[in-house]
Amino acid sequence: ELPANRGRILDRNGLILASSVPAASIWAIPEDVDQDKPEVRAKLKELARLMGMPLAELQRKLADEDKTFVWIRRQLDWDIGQQIAALDIPGIYQRKEYKRQYPEGESAAHVVGFTNVEDKGQEGMELAFNDLLAGRAGSRRVIKDRMGRVVEGVGEVVPPMDGRDMQLSIDSKVQFFAYQKLRDQVIAHKAKA
């Protein structure tokens, strides 16, 4: 599967309320990670550090050698993914995905909504217009070796169709000030709802 880039959500002035950035998701074939080798153990320690994960948690995820696939960490920053790829640990792989960013944060969250780790809309405009924003994933048929490397392409490549951008009628600056005033009053009056 070739992932499509989700469309952006913009305010009426074209300022970005939601956009997608490349992210690296790390996965493993536990039986292919030889934790008995000192050089692999050293690389796993560095992998855990790069991901901000305790080494014990990483080792636990890799302990079940009966599993043929396990996610280690989803949607890491792309540059961290490149550092992980440079470690070249046998049995550890990565997949390019997209991660949503919301520059306006809480001030527009109730309108914009959010997506889950699978990049599907869960609330707000992200949910209501999921089909428009999501686009369509592409595909290509390939033959892979046991290490997950592409050996040969077979058949045609269907390119992904990126999602469409959506422009809202709200003004993010006005929204920000209204949100601030509302938040200040909630705090001042110790409101619970």
Indicate residue ranges for each PLM-predicted region:
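Generic short beta-strand
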Residues: 6-9, 141
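Membrane-interface junction motifs in transport/secretion proteins
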Residues: 1-7, 22
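Hydrophobic (often cysteine-bearing) scaffold residues that line and stabilize catalytic clefts
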Residues: 6, 40, 170, 174
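Short, small/polar residue-rich loop motifs at catalytic or cofactor-binding pockets
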Residues: 2-4, 137, 189-193
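Short, conserved charged micro-motifs
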Residues: 34-42
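Small/polar-residue-rich segments within soluble enzyme cores
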Residues: 18-23, 28, 42-49, 60-164
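Conserved, well-ordered alpha-helix/loop/beta-strand core segments that scaffold catalytic motifs
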Residues: 69, 151-191
